[in-house]
């Protein structure tokens, strides 16, 4: 069995949906499960809905209408029959979204976020499943929330592997083409949970692990895994073969092509991960697999923008040792801060973090009880794997270096 994953960019419009059908016809879809993300920038648009629910109720209906208009435009291009069942199915999903927002009593942002954000994937898979069925690619639509079970850590849930594997092996018919949603799960109370932004790759890996799949293929708008993001670097190179360990390192440091959690379940069963272009589906792409070293072995650049650099120092010039460092990390964990790089000396501690949950104020309140804290926002973190002097110079030229850390062949540089 094989697992395919199509991200939002691949299904951002009617042409993208038709291209998915063409790819399936050309590469084959027997014994396949397809994981699909929300269309285009729908997740971002649903985040606007969540924010307006909490802060600008008067804009709530308008923001939902924007998402409706976007999807109905795609539906009208794909389905000529105005009485097609896809209309009432999508109508029902939007009604469910509106009903939740009217009934909800929870003040918890992360809980509301997950109950709202899931509609992007539910709507996209409904449209695509219907279109494929109409065009001779018969498939079964599956609500992934009935299969992937998690804890209740909304927005970044952890998988209950035992229950999830039992559900998937019981309910997935390997002989059929199955279509399901990425990024989503549900907790013990059947409330929707999410696996972290860009978590659809992880969903594909979960299914691959549980079904002992032969491979996972992620279809993207790039030719494969490049050694740098072409939006920010010139003369990028395609990485043809990547060892699992190297891919995990790249993902950990923030390489955007592969979700960090995706690789661990695949490595455990040595399931190869292919990254291929939906623009040029006949091209070979990249393979993450059981090879001894990176091919070609070149410096790899990872860029993370909009980071926050926190510089802590003790108020009385006492050492920042185990107890103080423990307090710092407990505070970071409580604020759901993702640590990108740390550096410490006897009386100072610097940490670069990703404030994706908007909890900086909460974190500072705790840290300032114990330390003097300096905050530098909007910094950029560069990580270079297999760094060379020339690669380091490429990053540092013309920039103000705030922090630099060198470990083996990995260099991390924070710049203003």
Question: What are these regions, as identified by a protein language model?
Answer:
Residues 135, 269, 335:
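Conserved dinucleotide-binding and phosphotransfer motif residues
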Residues 172-187, 250-274, 311-325, 376-396:
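Electropositive, surface-exposed helix/loop patches at the edges of structured domains
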């Amino acid at each position: 069995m094989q697992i395919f994953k199509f991200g939002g960019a691949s299904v951002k419009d009617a042409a993208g949906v038709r291209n998915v059908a063409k790819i399936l016809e050309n590469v084959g879809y027997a014994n396949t499960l397809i994981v699909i993300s929300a269309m285009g920038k729908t997740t971002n648009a649903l985040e606007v809905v969540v924010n307006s629910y909490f802060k600008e109720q008067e804009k709530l209906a308008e923001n939902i209408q924007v998402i409706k208009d976007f999807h109905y435009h795609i539906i009208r291009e794909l389905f000529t029959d105005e009485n097609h069942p896809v209309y009432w199915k999508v109508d029902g999903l939007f009604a469910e979204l509106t009903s939740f927002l009217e009934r909800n009593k929870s003040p918890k942002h992360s809980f509301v976020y997950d109950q709202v954000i899931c509609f992007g994937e539910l709507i996209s898979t409904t449209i695509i499943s219907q279109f494929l069925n109409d065009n001779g690619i018969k498939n079964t639509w599956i609500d992934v929330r009935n299969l992937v079970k998690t804890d209740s850590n909304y927005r970044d849930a952890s998988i209950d592997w035992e229950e999830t594997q039992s559900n998937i092996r019981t309910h997935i018919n390997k002989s059929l083409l199955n279509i399901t949603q990425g990024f989503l799960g549900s907790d013990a109370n059947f409330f929707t949970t999410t696996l972290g932004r860009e978590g659809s790759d992880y969903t594909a890996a979960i299914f691959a692990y549980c079904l002992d799949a032969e491979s996972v293929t992620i279809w993207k708008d790039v030719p494969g895994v490049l050694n740098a993001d072409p939006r920010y670097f010139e003369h990028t190179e395609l990485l043809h073969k990547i060892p699992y360990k190297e891919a995990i390192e790249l993902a950990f440091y923030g390489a955007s092509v592969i979700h960090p959690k995706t690789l661990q379940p695949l490595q455990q069963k040595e399931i190869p991960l292919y990254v291929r272009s939906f623009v040029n589906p006949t091209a070979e792409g990249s393979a993450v697999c059981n090879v001894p070293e990176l091919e070609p072995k070149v410096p790899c650049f990872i860029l993370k923008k909009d980071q926050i650099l926190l510089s802590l120092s003790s108020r009385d010039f006492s050492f920042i040792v185990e107890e103080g460092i423990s307090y710092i990390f407990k505070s970071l964990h409580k604020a759901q801060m993702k640590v990108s790089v740390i550096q410490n000396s006897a009386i100072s501690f610097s940490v670069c973090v990703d404030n994706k949950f908007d909890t900086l104020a909460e974190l500072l309140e705790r840290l300032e009880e114990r330390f003097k804290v300096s905050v530098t926002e909007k910094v950029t973190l560069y990580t270079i794997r297999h760094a060379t002097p020339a690669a380091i110079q490429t990053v540092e030229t013309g920039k103000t270096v705030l922090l630099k850390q060198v470990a083996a062949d990995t260099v991390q540089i924070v710049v203003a």
